Amino acid sequence: IYDRLVGSEMCIRDSHHAAGERDNNIGWWDEFIGHDKTIDTNRFFVVSVNNLGSCFGSSGPLSKDKNGKRFNNNFPQLEVIDWVETQKMLADKLGIKKWHLVIGGSLGGMQSLQWAVSYPKMVKKVGILAAAAKTSSQNIALNEVEREVIRKDNDFYDGKYLEFNKSPVKGLKAARMLGHITYCLLYTSD
C-alpha cells in the first residue's frame, strides 16, 4: 500500500483476498481496510498478494509442468522465506522502496516477521498477528497428523486424486477439524 501522504508503502499479508466495498465476497480484512478504517484507503494503497503455491491462483501442486502433467507431490517444498522473496520481487517490479506496514495473521504474520528479518530497511512497521517466530514441536506434530489424515483418505491417490476424478474430502474435513481444535486450545490452555 502506498502512503498517499508521505510516500511510503504498506503491505497486507494473508490470502490475497482483501476484498473491499466493491467486492461482494467478504474478505478477512474487511473490518480493517477501507475508507476511514484502521488501514485507511484514503491514505494508503493496499497491496495484498497471493503466495506462490497457494490454492488462491498461483502456480502450485495442481499446476501443470512443461509436459502437461500436474506437479502434484513433485512441486517444490516452499518456506516462508520463499514467499517473502517473491513478494520482494513484486515490490521491486512495482518500484516500491519501503513499505509503511507489512501485516498478516498466522502464516501471513510469519511472512511479516521474515520481511523484518530479511529486509529491515524496506519495512517501517510490522504487524504480526497470531504467529510465532518458531513453530512448537506440538504444532509440528499436529500438522503432521493433519497431513497423514489427508494422505490416508482413500480418495487421495498419493496426491494424484484429480487424475482419478476424486477429491480427498473426508481427509480434508478431518484435518480441518483437528486444525480448529488446535486453534481452540490456544485460547483455553494456561
Q: What kind of feature is each model-predicted range?
A:
Residues K66-G68, V123:
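A short alpha->loop->secondary-structure connector
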Residues W28-G34, M110, E163-N165:
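Short alpha-helical segments and helix-capping/turn motifs at coil-helix boundaries
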